[in-house]
Amino acid sequence: MFLSLLLWSLATYAQKPEHYYVRINTGKGEAILKLYNETPKHRNNFHKLVKEGFYDSLLFHRVIHNFMIQGGDPDSRYAADRVMLGNGGPDYKIPAEIQEGIIHRKGTIGAARDNNPAKQSSGSQFYLVQGRKFTDAGLDSLETFRLKGKKLTDLQRRTYKEIGGVPHLDGEYTVFGELISGIEVVDKIAAVKTDERDRPLVNERMAMKLLTRREAINLEREAQGLEPKSGFFTRLFDSLKSLDYKL
């Protein structure tokens, strides 16, 4: 019996989660972010920076209600009040990984960038989408005036009517993940008062931590309606093996 339990525990522990997950803590609450495997360069870069503690104590330095909240500028960690931010980051860019069908619906995370023809992303700056819901008439108007006649897909129209988001960013910026909990945190931060440069008048800081192998597996099991893995052997293997994992 003991041997059977041991072998079963070994087999289940050998399983890997399907995605990387990040816990984002803010003064307005906690959110859990899932990183997309369809955008591996952005996924791996964000995973690396979170693991290094890069984002801890940085500000959401640009906040626009019904649009997005932006952070990831390392210059924001010790920035004085009212100082303009948004130009800091690592000395590299990430090649664009813009995917058809991965769109700017509410709760997604996108990579910020400067104006460059290759649409390369900032090495660290990101935004969480709030956006808003649209009507058919509103989307028709967007197609005509903002998108210069480009037609939205059925998926885009349905998503932006039912969930909301920022459709005019589609195809221009890389979306590389989504919040699976804590979307209300985005709404709360997006509602704060800001200055003329869209910087919050009261600093909104962040801290990030990767979910462990066990936390990620249990999160995915819960999404499938399964019981979380627990018990003596699970705790034993967690203590003997690195809690981190690689995809």
Each language-model region and where it sits:
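Bacterial N-terminal signal peptides
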Residues: 1-9
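Cyclophilin-like peptidyl-prolyl cis-trans isomerases
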Residues: 12-247
